[in-house]
């Protein structure tokens, strides 16, 4: 497998069918079970149930055993289209299915799938028969709670997660990846490296510790340097903005449920979930000419979104975060060159973080059925994105009809060291937000008439917090030298050499490196072990010989030790940092 997150339709179908087999097994083992929904998801599937009694992970082997028993029947998956009346009668004892049926449009086809003794309301597709499901190619993973339809006012259901693969060896490979992913979990490593913590009483908000904040600022300053080189102007917009702005932008109608809302002086305000309306407001200040375009406004924008507590995950999914956000205001003629420029910037930045071109996937989302603008405009916009990818040497897969209603977009996904995929960067064309119907941004064209600019929404990293989580897991906490919050620790072999260790620290500090002299009372071996656990890449051991020769014994993270003069180590580390070297050796 090229990546463990298999996207093929065939594998998704297999997983969906395995979910049905699991549902049949659960119904067999727990009579009276009410079944809800059971889709295929990334890496596997799940099914939600209302069970007659609580179950836990100890029950999973029995369910797996029943599933394998069902598979021996080699039953076919048979589709049948039925009337609404028949569906309501068939599922009269299944309240969740009845609710789904009643919620379907009057003209929508209602289909069921039969397999063995189990019948489910389902659109499909499915494999032909249970013989297509390898009895050793699936595993039930865990049990969790899930509110019906994600609504905390509705019943809490039991969700059983599983994974399914075409071959047992694929399953084995996936489970090995999960084991390695557990070791690389950013929450575990973040704690070991003393980077951050999250308070149980304040979920979704990060407390950055000194080392973690150093890492954060290193990334932020790197991005700031790159975008300045690329002609962006950095701005800052208010964290709290009035309801009237969100209504005009369209976010109030489409995004209100995800916004934190407050009231002051009988007016409603919202903590911003995104930065785009604020950037349009900046563009609108003063008269703009076509000569001012393209105008590139960038912001490390603090955003807050009211994410359900159950969806929060470390620093990967949080409520308060900062985006490396930017919006480019340009003419239609400038779209292609601006997107090309952005793609080149994105490739360079990803490479510096250790993601080469073959670790970048690009999805090109084209016009949806419901959209604004005429076909000629969409033709030009889509061609501009396609040409930009070609200019940057980026191959893409087309996602037909998945563009936003206001314009097509490119989405950039990174493949990490375990083959997992993380969607990070994006660039979207927007004809709607600057329009007269929304925020009415205008410039004076070369014809002396007013025009609305095209707006390009773009980000490279996305959420800085989430990207840091991705980096931690990608490199197992062992950051490249330029990123490491602590680039070197000086460890004296005995207290007699503390003064020399502090001298080395001062010299390295003056050169701009992030170093610590560990002159604590622990024994040398304990110090070395501690800094190894904290993922420090260079430990500089100093004793009598090093002090006499103005040198350091450089203990490499991957093993081995090399004596260098202090000047040699400075040159060595400077070269690693300046070249954005990924390998510390």
Curated annotation (Swiss-Prot):
Q: Which cofactor does it need?
A: Zn(2+)
Give the UniProt subcellular location, in the record's own words: Cytoplasm
What are the protein's GO molecular function terms?
ATP binding; metal ion binding; threonine-tRNA ligase activity; tRNA binding
Region: Catalytic, residue numbers: 185-480
An annotated GO cellular component: cytoplasm
Q: How is the cofactor bound?
A: Binds 1 zinc ion per subunit.
Catalysis performed (reactions): tRNA(Thr) + L-threonine + ATP = L-threonyl-tRNA(Thr) + AMP + diphosphate + H(+)
Which Pfam families does this UniProt record tie to the protein?
HGTP_anticodon, tRNA-synt_2b, tRNA_SAD
Q: Which InterPro entries match?
A: aa-tRNA-synt_IIb, aa-tRNA-synth_II, aa-tRNA-synth_II/BPL/LPL, Anticodon-bd, Anticodon-bd_dom_sf, Thr-tRNA-ligase_IIa, Thr/Ala-tRNA-synth_IIc_edit, ThrRS_anticodon
**Main subcellular location:** cytoplasm
GO BP terms in the entry:
threonyl-tRNA aminoacylation
- Entry EC number(s): 6.1.1.3
Record key words, sorted? Aminoacyl-tRNA synthetase, ATP-binding, Cytoplasm, Ligase, Metal-binding, Nucleotide-binding, Protein biosynthesis, RNA-binding, tRNA-binding, Zinc
**Ligand binding (Zn(2+)):** 276, 327, 457
Q: How does it assemble?
A: Homodimer.
The family classification in the record reads:
Belongs to the class-II aminoacyl-tRNA synthetase family.
Described by its record, this protein's role is as follows: Catalyzes the attachment of threonine to tRNA(Thr) in a two-step reaction: L-threonine is first activated by ATP to form Thr-AMP and then transferred to the acceptor end of tRNA(Thr). Also edits incorrectly charged L-seryl-tRNA(Thr).
Q: Protein name, please?
A: Threonine--tRNA ligase
The organism is: Treponema denticola (strain ATCC 35405 / DSM 14222 / CIP 103919 / JCM 8153 / KCTC 15104)
Q: What's the source species' lineage?
A: Bacteria, Pseudomonadati, Spirochaetota, Spirochaetia, Spirochaetales
């Amino acid at each position: 497998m090229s990546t463990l997150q298999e996207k093929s339709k065939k594998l998704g179908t297999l997983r969906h069918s395995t979910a049905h087999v699991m549902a049949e097994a659960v119904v067999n083992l727990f009579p009276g079970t009410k079944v809800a929904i059971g889709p295929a998801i990334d890496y596997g599937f799940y099914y939600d149930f209302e069970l007659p009694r609580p179950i836990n992970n100890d029950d999973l082997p029995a369910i797996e055993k029943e599933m394998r028993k069902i598979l021996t029947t080699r039953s076919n998956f048979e589709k049948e289209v039925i009337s609404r009346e028949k569906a309501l009668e068939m599922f009269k004892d299944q309240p969740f299915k009845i609710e789904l049926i009643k919620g379907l449009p009057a003209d929508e086809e209602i289909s069921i799938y039969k397999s063995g003794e189990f019948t489910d309301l389902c659109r499909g597709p499915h494999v032909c028969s249970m013989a297509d499901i390898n009895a050793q190619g699936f595993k039930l993973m865990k049990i969790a709670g899930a509110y019906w339809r994600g609504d905390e006012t509705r019943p809490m259901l039991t969700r059983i997660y599983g994974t399914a693969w075409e071959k047992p060896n694929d399953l084995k490979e996936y489970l090995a990846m999960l084991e390695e992913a557990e070791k690389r979990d950013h929450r575990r490593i973040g704690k070991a490296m003393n980077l951050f913590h999250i308070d149980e009483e304040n979920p979704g908000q990060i407390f950055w510790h000194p080392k973690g904040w150093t890492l954060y600022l290193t990334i932020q300053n790197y991005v700031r340097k790159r975008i300045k080189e690329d002609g962006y102007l950095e701005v800052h917009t208010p964290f709290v903005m009035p309801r009237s702005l969100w209504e005009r932008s369209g976010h109030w109608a489409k995004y209100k449920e995800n916004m934190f809302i407050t009231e002051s002086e009988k007016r409603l305000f919202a903590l911003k979930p995104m930065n785009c309306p604020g950037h349009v407001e900046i563009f609108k200040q003063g008269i703009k000419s076509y000569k001012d375009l393209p105008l590139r406004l960038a912001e490390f924008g603090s955003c807050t979104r009211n994410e359900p507590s159950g969806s929060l995950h470390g620093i990967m999914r949080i409520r308060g975060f900062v985006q490396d956000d930017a919006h480019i205001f340009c003419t239609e003629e400038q779209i292609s060159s601006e997107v090309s420029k952005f793609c080149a910037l994105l490739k360079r930045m990803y490479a510096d973080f250790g993601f080469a071109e073959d670790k970048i996937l690009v999805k090109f989302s084209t016009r949806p059925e419901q959209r604004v603008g005429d076909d000629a405009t969409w033709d030009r916009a889509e061609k501009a994105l396609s040409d930009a990818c070609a200019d940057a040497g980026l191959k893409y897969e087309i996602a037909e009809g998945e563009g936003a209603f206001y314009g097509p977009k490119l989405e950039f996904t990174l493949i990490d060291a375990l083959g997992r995929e993380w969607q990070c960067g994006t660039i979207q064309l927007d004809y709607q937000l600057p329009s007269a119907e929304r925020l009415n941004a205008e410039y004076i064209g070369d014809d002396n008439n007013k025009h609305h600019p095209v707006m390009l929404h773009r980000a490279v990293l996305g959420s800085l917090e989430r990207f840091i989580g991705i980096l931690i897991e990608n490199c197992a906490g062992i950051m490249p030298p330029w990123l490491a919050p602590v680039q070197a620790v000086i460890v004296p072999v005995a207290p007699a050499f503390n003064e020399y260790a502090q001298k080395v620290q001062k010299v390295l500090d003056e050169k701009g490196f992030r170093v610590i002299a560990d002159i604590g009372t622990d024994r040398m071996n304990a110090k070395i072990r501690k800094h190894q656990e904290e993922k420090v890449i260079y430990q500089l051991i100093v004793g009598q010989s090093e002090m006499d020769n103005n040198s350091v014994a450089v203990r490499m993270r991957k093993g081995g030790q090399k004596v260098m003069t202090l000047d040699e180590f400075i040159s060595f580390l400077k070269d690693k940092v300046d070249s954005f070297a990924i390998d510390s050796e």
